[in-house]
Structures are given as C-alpha cells and as structure tokens.
Amino acid sequence: SKDNYITNKIISTSLSASDANVGQASTLDLFKLYDETSFSGYTGSYSAPTEFSRLLIAFNTTAISRSISPYAELDGFKAYLSLKDINGSQIAPKEFNTIVYPLSQSWDEGRGTDIYSFNDLGRSNWMTASYTSGAEVLWHTQGAKSEGYLDSSDIDVISSGSIAGGSSELLYSTQYFEKGHEDLFVDITTQLSATMAGFLPDQGFLIAFSGSEETDSKSRFVKRFASRHTRDPYLRPSIVIAYDDHKNDARDRLVFNTTGSLFLENKILGAYSNLLSGSNNTNMTGSDVLSVIFHTGSYAVTASGGQYDPANKYLLGVYTASVSFDRFITASVRASAGFDEHINTSGSLKIYERWMDADERVTFYTGSFN
C-alpha cells in the first residue's frame, strides 16, 4: 500500500510547496486556505490565492482479492475505505463534504516527511505524479483533479464510466462530516470490485473537498487522518470487507407453512471438507447435489440440497436445504392423527431427517429435531 498528500500551500511570498513530497509523513492532512497568504505572481483561477491539499491512497488489491476469493464473489461483498481521524481535541473544520475518486494514473509515494516547512522535494507532488523511465510524469491538471469518463486519456481521476458493458454510472463516493472529527468511512464496493475484475485501473483513490467547497471563499483547516506510517497499526488506512456468511439454521424454530433453511456441516479432523460422491468419489459441489428426506409417521417430504453460497461463493463443506411443513396435511403422524391434531394433543412433533446424495444411494447424515 501507499499514501501521500499533495499541496500547493504557500511557504513564503514567492515559494509554494507544489514540488514538495510528504509521502512518509505519519498524517494525511486535508485542508483549504482561502486568501490567507499573499503570493507574488499569483495566476490562480479564483479571485484570491487558494491553498489546497488532496490525499492519495492505494492498497494491494491483489492481496485483498486473494483473501476474499475463498468466501465471496466480486458481486457478493461490500467494501469500505476507512481513514481514522487523529485531530483529537484540536480544532477541525466542520459541516463539509469529501469526495473519493478512483485515480486514473500511477503515482509515487515518495520519501518526504516535512509537513511544516515542506523542504523535502520529490514525487508525487502537486504538479508531478511520478518519475518514470527517467522522466517526470505530470498530472494532467495540477493537483491531480482533471476528472472525466473511464478510459479517457487526459484525466487524473475517474468520475463516471461503464463497467463491463453496463450502463454509465458515477464512480465516486462522498461523505458528509457534520462535526469534523468523524472517521472517513465510505462505500467503495463498485470501485474495488471493478478494479479487481480489471475494469478500473489499479491506481488507488484521491480524496478531496467536494464541489463548491473547493471554490468558495472559506478556509477549512485542518482535517487530519492517520497515514500508513503512523506507529499505531490500528489507526492506519484500511479497506474493510463485509459479507454475510451467517447460517440461520431453522431446526429449533421451524414454523408450519413457512419455509425454513436447515444446514449440514461436514468436517474432517476439525476442518471443513466437501462431501464425497458415493458413485465416483468426487467432491460434491454446487446446487442440487443432495436429496434431503424429512419424515415422521407416514408423512415424508423430499427437498433438494446443495452447497451454501451466502456471498455468491460456495462455502467449503457447508450444505443447506429449505423445507416447509403443512400443518393441515392429512397424512397421519401417530395413531392416525395428522399434524394439526397431533400438535394440539401433544404440543410437540419430532421430524426425522436423512441427507443423501441426489441419487439417494448414499446417506451422509441422519438425525431428528422437534
């Protein structure tokens, strides 16, 4: 992973930090200063000198993809970019919006550490993205804020695009900070999954103040996050992956005339392992590979079972089947009594279960539940 923040902060009346690098600093500082320092020969776009910073951050998406792949497909998880606030009790701007763009071109983290005088020169910085093949590679617009459509050749950040031939969609995320001391926590599911699938360039993200909050006549100093170089590992930037793999087994709370899911877990020496087919000794994977018989008295019903795929990814050694029992079925349960009569008389009902291969030749598990 890597991170940095780039800035055009004015150091003196004739010098700015536009070519300075702070890639090894322990903080990521997001700020805007409006008309607070004079600068000789200012030729900016606004009526007064405006000083900005913008954050750059990237992660090892190959490692992330490798850790996710056993449990979830690319469309089966949620991903969040997390930056920890370290302003503490210090004054911070409030009531502002941030925007998070996917970056379009590569950039260097750099070796700079000086966030006070900005004396460490290097790339990346406000003007230059990287030093590649013996040459400076400039941002398309100073400050890395040239935005546009995916696959455009003259952009620094991607604002929209079509992923895998789908409809055009916005590819940035936003967050509102009411009090100013909140952590940044934004949904980047689309951006990350598209990056891992090869539809977005794997260059990380740019974080900036959003829209008019970069062009208005207000100063916002300083929103400070921990960088990856902070000593506390729990404060470092991260991508949080979330997916739902819980198993809500209905054996002890089945309701008549309502479908419930039952689960079968197979372990060998404590480790999850797929069932083996009795006919050819191959792993039983996918849907509809099991036949599950539920019976009591003269009543029986068969349900199809298969591997459990909570995040669109089949889980090793976990199988599920869904079933519903009709309370008013006429088949006798005991002593010629049907479900309804038996329940009213005894207050309970025992159901037997048998998990078999789809051909019903091999039994993997038998049991019962009330």
What are these regions (language model features)?
Residues 1-370:
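Secreted, disulfide-rich extracellular signaling modules
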